[in-house]
Amino acid sequence: MAKRKEEVFNWEDEEQEEIIWVSKSEIKRDAEALKKLGEKLVNLTKTNLDKIPLDTGLRDAVELAQRLQKEALRRQIQYIGKLLRAIDPEPIQEALNKIENKHQQQQAKLHKLELLRDELVQKGNSAFTELLIQYPHADRQHLHNLIRSAQKEREQNKPPKSYREIFQYLKDLILED
């Protein structure tokens, strides 16, 4: 009969590794979050999907899910969530946030243009000279005529045609830079 060598484990010699216990509920929450990330990927257009760094298996699964309906779609999204659990989802999430924020950034730029237009019509020359300092290649005469006609339209309670034209001109001027 062979003798077994007994291994004596000395707990004091080992480095203390901190064990992090994760609850089952937290694991489920993480899985659900990844499943929702998968749903967002499925709802993207082809051009936006190309901007996201996906491996080929995940990309194929997402493209298949875009063609499925109802229960098959639900199962495919579950599968996409499973694939996302196996990889690091941070780069995917960052790329998705960048795509989603692009629309909000565009809206913020348009809102700033509206405020600038209002300032041009209300303040007149002071705001006009500030704009010309920032954008010296602007058509000074055309913009000045638009501002004057917008002020007249406001005084006479006419439809704000020039007001809209100022916005379009500013949009063309500023967003092209």
UniProtKB/Swiss-Prot annotation:
SUPFAM superfamilies, alphabetized: PSPTO4464-like
CDD domains: YjgA-like
Cellular component, GO annotation: cytosol
Keywords annotated in UniProt: Cytoplasm, Ribosome biogenesis, RNA-binding, rRNA-binding
One of the GO BP terms on file: assembly of large subunit precursor of preribosome
Location(s), subcellular: Cytoplasm
InterPro entries to which the protein is assigned, alphabetical: DarP, DarP_sf
Keyword Isomerase attributed: no
UniProt GO MF annotations: ribosome binding; rRNA binding
Chief location bin: cytoplasm
Protein name (record): Dual-action ribosomal maturation protein DarP
Organism, as annotated: Histophilus somni (strain 129Pt) (Haemophilus somnus)
Lineage of the species this protein comes from: Bacteria, Pseudomonadati, Pseudomonadota, Gammaproteobacteria, Pasteurellales
